From Swiss-Prot:
This is Putative cysteine proteinase inhibitor 7. SMART domains: CY. GO terms for cellular component: extracellular region. Residues 28-84 form the Cystatin domain. It comes from Oryza sativa subsp. japonica. SUPFAM superfamilies: Cystatin/monellin. Transmembrane segments: none annotated. CDD domains: CY (cd00042).
């Protein structure tokens, strides 16, 4: 192997190691989401509808996602702060955690949905 080939090979290995290290650091950590992304707003709308389905009184209406984070795991966890209103009550803020296994298949699970006091 020539010196030039060895240097190129070493540089390529270094680049791969840096990229792999950067990717590994982000897996599992929470990162902000763009609340203006239509997909994020759809996840918030879905979370409210899913929660409303399980509540006897019902009447919860999605307003908007105001903040959020995502966590890449075997799929993606979304922790969303959202506003919703209910019939006969004042508007409220809620935190919803939605697990989305694959955005293309709409395989979702509402992990939690809690009012923010």
């Amino acid at each position: 192997m020539t010196m030039r080939t060895s240097s190129l090979l070493l540089a390529a290995v270094a680049v791969v190691a840096i990229v792999a290290g950067a990717t590994a650091a982000t897996v599992g950590s929470w990162e902000p989401v763009d609340i203006n992304d239509p997909h994020v707003q759809e996840l918030g709308r879905w979370a409210v509808a899913e929660e409303d389905r399980g509540v006897a009184a019902g009447g919860l209406t999605f307003e908007r996602v105001t903040d959020g984070e995502k966590q890449v795991v075997a799929g993606v966890n979304y922790r969303l702060t959202l506003e919703a209103s209910s019939s006969g009550a004042k508007d409220g803020r809620y935190e919803a955690v939605v697990y989305e296994q694959d955005p293309r298949s709409n395989a979702r699970k509402l992990v939690s949905f809690e009012p923010i006091h």
